[in-house]
């Protein structure tokens, strides 16, 4: 919002800024691998997307003090900074791609972004949780590509 003159368009997906549904009880069991696995699975409509490699990466992140502090700071910032009154200032094309079954940032948040941002387009991916680009990468990339193609065509006219 501070440098809109340097941005041609934006794409939001599962974005914070209006409503936050935390992962519940934070990371009280951060050293419990099974707990981290369950929280990771909760992110997706299809819990099998939470591969061992992904769970390992998240487990290592939350158990690395410096990384965990950054994650917590980012989450607290999202809770403190509600952007509802600022979104109407976005005067560039906005592409919103949302998981239809997002438990972290529910679909109504994406719908609200669409209402509040002028010139915004919302696309919903069914059977998809919070991380659409991971759960349905082909569909996500096709939607992003179409938005950018349409934007480029408009700019050429």
Task: Please tell me what each predicted stretch does.
Residues 30-92:
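Conserved alpha/beta-hydrolase catalytic His-Asp/Glu region
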Residues 39, 71, 75, 113, ...:
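Hydrophobic "lid"/C-terminal helical patch
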Residues 69-70, 76-115, 124:
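Conserved serine/cysteine hydrolase catalytic core
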Residues 1-19:
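Conserved hydrolase catalytic core segment
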């Amino acid at each position: 919002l501070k440098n809109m003159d340097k941005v041609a368009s934006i794409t939001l997906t599962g974005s914070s800024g209006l409503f936050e549904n935390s992962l519940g009880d934070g990371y009280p069991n951060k050293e419990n691998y099974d707990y981290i696995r369950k929280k990771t699975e909760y992110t997706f409509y299809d819990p099998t997307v939470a591969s061992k490699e992904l769970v390992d990466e998240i487990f290592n992140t939350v158990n690395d003090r410096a990384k965990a502090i950054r994650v917590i700071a980012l989450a607290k910032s999202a809770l403190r900074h509600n952007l509802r009154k600022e979104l109407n200032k976005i005067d560039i094309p906005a592409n919103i791609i949302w998981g239809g079954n997002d438990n972290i940032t529910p679909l109504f948040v994406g719908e609200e972004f669409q209402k509040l941002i002028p010139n915004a387009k919302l696309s919903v991916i069914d059977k998809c949780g919070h991380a659409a680009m991971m759960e349905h990468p082909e569909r996500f990339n096709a939607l992003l590509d179409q938005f950018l193609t349409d934007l480029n065509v408009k700019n050429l006219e």
